[in-house]
Amino acid sequence: MARALVLLSVVLVSLLVNQGTASENQRLFNNAVIRVQHLHQLAAKMINDFEDNLLPEERRQLSKIFPLSFCNSDSIEAPTGKDETQKSSMLKLLRISFRLIESWEFPSQTLSGAVSNSLTVGNPNQITEKLADLKVGISVLIKGCLDGQPNMDDNDSLPLPFEDFYLTMGESSLRESFRLLACFKKDMHKVETYLRVANCRRSLDSNCTL
């Protein structure tokens, strides 16, 4: 009888620990989604404010740039459409999100110059800090998915895209700024999508359609 009570106690403790871990992971996922959603909204606001300050002819010329031919993150392997995204594992989506966020740590420092004339966008200098916080959160989620297993992802050992990509393209300052903002918005939209689907992957019964 005593042995049965001990076993029951062990099972109950294990269930409570697992429940607590699942609850903490859900909290981390929710925070990550909220953070990247804020960054995506901020990116959209930044580029809208930038475009509002352009002359009609400047706006017409820059409209030819998008859809973008090249972004700093284009060398990072990622799902190319909704179907591929939905078929990707939670771990894969987290790893790609981590790489995308990491690729913006240096370029984000130049965003303040791109929107220096905007008074409604907030403080762009805080973006680098927000990206760093999000990167840490995603890293914790990746470790949780690995559950003590070694990280065997080959992409983690690859060098990041060129840090000064947006500063060495030989374009005018106007085009550089527009490309920087457009690529930032594009990548934050990607990460938001990947994190939402990854979060949905945690529930096998969920419909993770985009």
UniProtKB/Swiss-Prot annotation:
Residues 1-23 form the signal peptide. Keywords: Disulfide bond, Hormone, Metal-binding, Secreted, Signal, Zinc. GO terms for cellular component: extracellular space. It is found in: Secreted. One of its GO terms (molecular function) is growth hormone activity. Zn(2+) binds at H38, E192. One of its GO terms (biological process) is positive regulation of receptor signaling pathway via JAK-STAT. Disulfide bonds join C71-C183, C200-C208. SUPFAM superfamilies: 4-helical cytokines. The keyword Zinc applies. Gene3D superfamilies: 1.20.1250.10. Belongs to the somatotropin/prolactin family. Growth hormone plays an important role in growth control. This is Somatotropin. It comes from Ctenopharyngodon idella. The lineage of its organism: Eukaryota, Metazoa, Chordata, Craniata, Vertebrata.
